[in-house]
Amino acid sequence: MKSVAVIRAGPAGIAAAKALAEQGLQAVVFDGKSHLGGMWQDAQAAPQGPAWEGMRTNLSKHNCCFSDHSHPSDMQDFPTVPEMGKYLSWLCTTLRFGKKYQALN
């Protein structure tokens, strides 16, 4: 199986790894942080991150999700930072798309 490096483990990196896996390639995701999701983590996980307390997405939960893995139905229309972080972490654990994640510390 061929491997492809994906730089950063935010939403775009996760989407890239998923798309690569769907094409039969193994994605190796590299990020400088020790958590998945990029800026979409709560203040405890990423205290120096760009997201602030109370921040929400500017897109509804119907527009900022993978078409085959929607947000929980009980989530508010515009997810908070911790909700997006949980969604992205859940996505990575449930998809099991053959991705390796390495934090570059």
List PLM regions with ranges:
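N-terminal Rossmann-like FAD-binding beta1-loop-alpha1 element of flavoenzymes
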Residues: 2-29
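Rossmann-like flavin
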Residues: 19, 85-98
